[in-house]
């Protein structure tokens, strides 16, 4: 009976260590807002595709992102919430995580709406939020991130 308890404890610790290792790998990843593209438009809303590049700098270990919740702004005005789930980044690679957004026209003022519809070079997109990775025993651990800018403010 004691052997089974010890074996169960050892198995639990090994699983927890693996989860902590993948979480550490995620903390060492680089994040960049790669693209924000207008994909659809109609009288009531605009559709966008947001691409976030996640670079795993570790040469041997994968990194795992449980989920990400963030806010996308354009020219310092709130645009939409961005959510990503269950992303695995293989060692020494870049993963382009994609999120599709539908934003009501009422979210934009007329000037900003015109700039977006023309894909103006004066647009400045910014993404911030919280990424969550799975820690020991399935506990989600939050880490605030500033993924960065794409557009006019990104020199």
Model-derived features with residue positions:
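Short structured motifs
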Residues: 32-38, 81-85, 111-114
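Sec-dependent N-terminal signal peptides
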Residues: 6-10
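Positively charged n-region of N-terminal signal peptides that target proteins for export
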Residues: 1-4
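C-terminal motif of bacterial Sec signal peptides marking the signal peptidase cleavage site
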Residues: 13-16
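Bacterial signal peptide processing site
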Residues: 18-21
């Amino acid at each position: 009976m004691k052997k089974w308890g010890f074996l169960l404890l050892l198995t639990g610790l090994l699983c927890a260590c693996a989860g902590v290792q993948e979480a550490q790998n995620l903390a060492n990843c680089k994040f960049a807002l790669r693209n924000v593209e207008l994909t659809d438009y109609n009288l009531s809303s605009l559709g966008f595709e947001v691409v976030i590049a996640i670079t795993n700098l570790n040469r041997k270990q994968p990194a795992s992102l449980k989920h990400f919740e963030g806010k996308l702004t354009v020219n310092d005005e709130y645009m939409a919430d961005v959510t990503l789930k269950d992303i695995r980044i293989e060692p020494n690679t870049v993963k382009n995580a994609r999120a599709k957004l539908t934003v009501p026209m009422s979210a934009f003022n007329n000037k900003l709406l015109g700039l977006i519809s023309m894909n103006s070079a004066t647009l400045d997109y910014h993404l911030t939020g919280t990424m969550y990775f799975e820690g020991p025993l399935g506990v989600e651990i939050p880490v605030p991130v500033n993924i960065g800018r794409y557009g006019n403010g990104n020199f």
